[in-house]
């Protein structure tokens, strides 16, 4: 797993040159976005339980066969495993967002995920749909505009007014991590 700083060092070392130019500008940008990045990860982490349960519920609403006898979310232990897996995926996406690098997601979460799910008979399309729901929720939480009418008292906002332009890059970055998960399941 490499963070932005480690990547810059490895890149400079491979060129046998000091860190400078574009690498230095990228590091400055990464540092400048640090507080927003922390706020974005906090927004996801603070709402993770609701995000996971809503994503799995949405997946089940679209495919009710999952909770029928013989479905992948029946009985309770399989439902618990589904919720656990969705939480793990969301956690690794937040790690990648915090580090500004997808390697932790690739190495520790996505490596072999499709093969494991296929061997266990987990429906990949339904899992990808749950991830897509979490992607939309994460974007809403990062932009600090989730629907309070739908979330009710469980909703935790970031607490600071957010200008959408400032968070557009973080929304795009987090979306790219969710897209990696969806692609790994395809």
Swiss-Prot record:
User: Any idea which UniProt keywords this protein has?
Assistant: Antenna complex, Bile pigment, Chromophore, Electron transport, Membrane, Methylation, Photosynthesis, Phycobilisome, Thylakoid, Transport
Where in the sequence is N4-methylasparagine found?
A: 72
* Keyword check for Electron transport: yes
> How does the entry describe its membrane topology?
Peripheral membrane protein
| Residues that hold (2R,3E)-phycoerythrobilin 2 according to the record | 82
Provide the leader sequence positions: none
PTM info:
Contains three covalently linked bilin chromophores.
**Where on this chain does (2R,3E)-phycoerythrobilin 1 bind?**
50, 61
- Which SUPFAM superfamilies does the UniProt record give? Globin-like (SSF46458)
Q: Which GO terms describe its biological process?
A: photosynthesis
> Which Gene Ontology cellular-component terms appear in the entry?
phycobilisome; plasma membrane-derived thylakoid membrane
* InterPro entries associated with the record: Globin-like_sf, Phycobilisome_asu/bsu, Phycobilisome_asu/bsu_sf
The UniProt entry lists the main location of this chain as membrane
Give compartment(s): Cellular thylakoid membrane
Return the Pfam families for the record: Phycobilisome
- At the top level, the lineage of the source is Bacteria
Binding sites annotated in the UniProt record for (2R,3E)-phycoerythrobilin 3 = 167
Q: What does this protein do?
A: Light-harvesting photosynthetic bile pigment-protein from the phycobiliprotein complex.
Entry similarity comment: Belongs to the phycobiliprotein family.
Subunit and partners? Heterodimer of an alpha and a beta chain.
Identification of the protein by name: C-phycoerythrin beta chain
Organism in which the protein naturally occurs:
Synechocystis sp. (strain PCC 6701)
Which lineage? Bacteria, Bacillati, Cyanobacteriota, Cyanophyceae, Oscillatoriophycideae
Point out the gene that encodes the protein: cpeB
